[in-house]
Amino acid sequence: MHLSIIIPAFNEERLIERCLQSITSSLAENFKPGFTSEIIVVDNNSTDNTANLAKQAGAQVVFEPINQIGRARNAGAAEATGDWLLFVDADSMLNPGLFADILRLIDDGKSVGCGSTVHMHGLPWWANLTLQLWLSTSILFRWASGALIVCRSDAFRDVGGFNQELYAAEEIGLSQQLKRWGRQRGLQFIILTRHPLETSSRKVALYSAHEVTGQILRVILHPRRTLQDKKQLSVWYDGRR
């Protein structure tokens, strides 16, 4: 089995090395004969040293000039040669336990893909409440967080990848399409819960409660209009790092 690990990255020089180290450590601890992998970092038009740091760490670097996370993930998938695709965000860290669970799911042959619960350190009460609400929703509806989504490469290509009309929440649409694809073939799409993915809480540190909750409310009240307009998604796209 050959696994392609794809990391979209826009101005991630502070965190990309940490992310890549977590991946190489997880790969090393879960090595087994017959398993191969590749790591692809998609430089999503960065203006910092992200691409050079990724190359120095041994990753293949692909350039995507249009700053859009779904488009960046698709660009990485277009270069991938794996039977399975693992998308993980540059501000997240894989852990060996989670990676082992992913490999077991792949070996089991009963799933089209999976997502994972996530953990963030140092959240204020309102942000932790928001996270817990999302986690409950994710598990109930089997919607993957964008921070980590894993799927068969043939399924990904059959459903058309990430929706490039959306600038955020495209992982929910992909989760739904993968569930449908899998259901037709007797396969499931699940959310792993034993070893949560560690992801950064920088949005909470960089944006006020008013900014974050306002962004969430706009998405809830006017989802299509908001998610298709990059200018209305400042928490994702204004470049604060």
Feature locations, PLM:
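Short, well-formed alpha-helical segments that are part of the catalytic scaffolds
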Residues: 12-31
